[in-house]
Amino acid sequence: MTPSLGSFIASLFAGAFIALAIGGVLVFISQSDRVTRS
């Protein structure tokens, strides 16, 4: 595996991890915030 391919795959994993983290935070906020919004 070439270094450029390795860094590309690493950036893909990093981006997926960040997207999942942001998604999890948004879901957590929407779940805990439901009472105040209704």
From Swiss-Prot:
Keywords: Chloroplast, Membrane, Photosynthesis, Photosystem II, Plastid, Thylakoid, Transmembrane, Transmembrane helix
Pfam families: PsbX
The keyword Ribonucleoprotein belongs to this UniProt entry's keyword annotation: no
Key word Cell inner membrane present: no
Function: Involved in the binding and/or turnover of quinones at the Q(B) site of photosystem II (PSII). PSII is a light-driven water plastoquinone oxidoreductase, using light energy to abstract electrons from H(2)O, generating a proton gradient subsequently used for ATP formation.
Assigned GO CC terms: chloroplast thylakoid membrane; photosystem II
Gene3D superfamilies (UniProt xref): Single helix bin (1.20.5.510)
Residue spans crossing the bilayer: 9-29
Protein name: Photosystem II reaction center protein X
Family to which the UniProt record says this protein belongs: Belongs to the PsbX family. Type 1 subfamily.
Localization per record: Plastid, Chloroplast thylakoid membrane
